[in-house]
Amino acid sequence: MARPKSEDKKQALLEAATAAFAQSGIAASTSAIARSAGVAEGTLFRYFATKDELLNELYLAIKLRLVRTMIAGLDPDEKRPKENARNIWNSYIDWGVRNPMEHKAIRRMALSERITDETRRQVKESFPELNEMCQLSVKEIFLSEAYRAFGDALFLSLAETTIEFASHDPQRAREIIALGFEAMWHALHEADAK
């Protein structure tokens, strides 16, 4: 009879995978992940049938925590697109500063072709209101299929730079985050959006 799975072991594996993917990218070995979690490699495969399954489950878990954080920072009464965008930006940057390992892991995993379309769809469909809000004032070209990935990359590059500088200079972090927001806003949003 198979032993029941332990949530503690699964959580330890997810935490070890987060650190491993943050440090080594998705090339991190399952044996290193298992060793870091304090379990045998075979145990890892009792919880995740393949490395890709581990990668996708971790990606989904981190993204959902991030999006919940971003939604929590929204003011339901705020109707101005720029202020909503500012709240989303501030929540995203604050999350990245507070969770450097998860942020680094998610950035590396997001580039992987091993993250399935189904996993990406689950993230997008989990919080449609956030997705809609983000699109309210974005330049139309960045909503097109041809330039959507480019617009996303611009946002993430500016966010990455802002997180890095805010992390290394906590006394000026608020100013850095505000300047980063203005740079992102001018790059990606329609001039008449307020």
Curated annotation (Swiss-Prot):
* InterPro entries per UniProt: DNA-bd_HTH_TetR-type_CS (IPR023772), Homeodomain-like_sf (IPR009057), HTH-type_TetR-like_transc_reg (IPR050109), HTH_TetR (IPR001647)
One Pfam family named in its UniProt record: TetR_N
Positions of the HTH tetR-type domain = 7-66
Q: Which GO terms describe its molecular function?
A: DNA binding; RNA binding
**DNA-binding stretch(es), residue numbering of this chain:** 29-48
Q: Subunit structure, briefly?
A: Homodimer. May bind DNA either as a homodimer or as a pair of homodimers. Binds small regulatory RNA sRamA5.
What's the stated role of this polypeptide?
A: Transcriptional regulator. Represses the transcription of the transcriptional activator RamA and, thereby, leads to repression of the expression of the efflux pump subunits AcrA and AcrB, and TolC. Acts by binding directly to the promoter region of the ramA gene. Promoter binding may be inhibited partially by the small regulatory RNA sRamA5, perhaps thereby ensuring a basal level of expression of RamA.
UniProt-recorded name of the protein: Transcriptional regulator RamR
Phylogenetic placement of the source organism: Bacteria, Pseudomonadati, Pseudomonadota, Gammaproteobacteria, Enterobacterales
